[in-house]
């Protein structure tokens, strides 16, 4: 389920719901007053599609009754059914802060890439960084992440693999002074922070949450050629947000 245990459900603060995609069972009356209602399952060209994960619904097998469909593809996140709604509470800006502790130096080439990423964010353009292992991709994104957080924006760095996610979290904790959430299948409950480190599957739990979404190792399993995770990334970024890969 999206909330991995009972403690997370009862302890969630309202601000922790900002930018999250929530099911009917996760809502309280207070949250519903603030939330935007979204469809669970939409009809597209005569077929039914899950709003959360984008999967096409098997109308013969994925049904609770003759009138009610559900999505089996993302049921591990909490069952959604066609006679209910999904809910999203708009993400709010953070208080801007200086967060970069890293004192290292980029090479001229790395600095050129770093400057290009900052420019892309300012211009609202997508960017692709392709480099071999050990080329310093992580350090090259430090300045654009710090710039976004200084502006009060929400940033997520997502990667397909849990081990990479955990390693990246450890490095960012040393080099950034802000609070950071780590999200994967076995992580602690989510709390709202300006910087989130997550596996790409965790993006299914967000809706228009991030101003800057960086997907690391985009060519790795299980992200590559996975329409569900492409849909998750599409949903997780704000309409005017910037995706990097």
Where are these regions (language model features)?
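Interdomain "pre-motor" coupling segment immediately N-terminal to P-loop NTPase/helicase cores
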Residues: 39-93
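Walker A/P-loop
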Residues: 122-146
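Inter-Walker segment of RecA-like/P-loop motor cores
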Residues: 171-207
């Amino acid at each position: 389920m999206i909330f991995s245990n009972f403690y997370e459900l009862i302890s969630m603060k309202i601000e922790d719901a900002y930018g999250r995609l929530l099911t009917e069972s996760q809502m309280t009356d207070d949250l519903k007053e603030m939330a935007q209602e979204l469809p669970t399952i939409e009809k597209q060209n005569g077929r039914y599609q899950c709003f959360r994960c984008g999967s096409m619904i098997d109308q013969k097998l994925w049904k609770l009754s003759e009138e009610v469909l559900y999505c089996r593809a993302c049921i591990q996140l909490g069952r959604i059914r066609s006679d209910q709604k999904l809910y999203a509470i708009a993400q709010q800006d953070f208080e801007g802060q200086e967060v970069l502790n890293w004192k290292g130096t980029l090479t001229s080439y790395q600095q050129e890439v770093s400057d290009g990423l900052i420019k892309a964010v300012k211009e609202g353009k997508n960017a692709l960084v392709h480099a071999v292992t050990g080329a310093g991709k992580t350090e090259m994104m430090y300045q654009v992440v710090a710039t976004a957080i200084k502006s009060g924006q929400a940033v997520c760095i997502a990667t397909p693999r849990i081990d990479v996610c955990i390693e990246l979290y450890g490095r960012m904790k040393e080099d950034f002074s802000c609070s950071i959430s780590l999200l994967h299948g076995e992580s602690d409950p989510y709390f709202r922070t300006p910087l989130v480190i997550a596996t790409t599957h965790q993006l299914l739990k967000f809706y228009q949450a991030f101003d800057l979404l960086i997907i690391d190792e985009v060519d790795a399993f299980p992200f590559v050629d996975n329409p569900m995770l492409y849909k998750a990334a599409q949903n997780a970024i704000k309409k005017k947000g910037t995706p990097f890969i």
